């Protein structure tokens, strides 16, 4: 064997030895490191009891709170911008709404009435389906309350009271509004003052 062949074999052997030393000195990846697995799982198992303790303590705090406070906090979470209930209309407005729908259901549909009275279509549907009517005592109390807050005292005063809600209703339905008024509020012919007789006829009967 000549000297060149010997040097070539020694060089190959040295390179293989150096490669083995490099492989032994390089650390294993985190996924293949046998010691990394138990430590990672241990960290995960250590977080779980802390979360359970926190949730348990939170539940105990909620149980110690009064029911009204729990309900109030739930409403705050549900309505972060505040509670804004839908608009409520008065009893005369409900009666007017039913009258308009009965007069012309096509013209005064749910969407049109919802736009005119500034309420939701679902509220209009519920009002039309409702058959409840106030008794005389309730109607009297409602009338007194309206008079207290400054409602008009004329026969069609409640129509003017609802002017803001019905200002876009066509004027040709004035007879419908008048017919929907309570019978007690309509002006009877007996309420007009009697005409005074001529003075000549009075003298004739005096004779």
UniProtKB/Swiss-Prot annotation:
Function: Required for respiratory activity and maintenance and expression of the mitochondrial genome.
Keywords annotated in UniProt: Mitochondrion, Transit peptide
PANTHER family assigned: NEUGRIN (PTHR13475:SF3)
Protein name: Required for respiratory growth protein 9, mitochondrial
Organism this protein belongs to: Puccinia graminis f. sp. tritici (strain CRL 75-36-700-3 / race SCCL)
Main location: mitochondrion
One GO CC term, this protein: nucleus
Coiled coil start-end: none
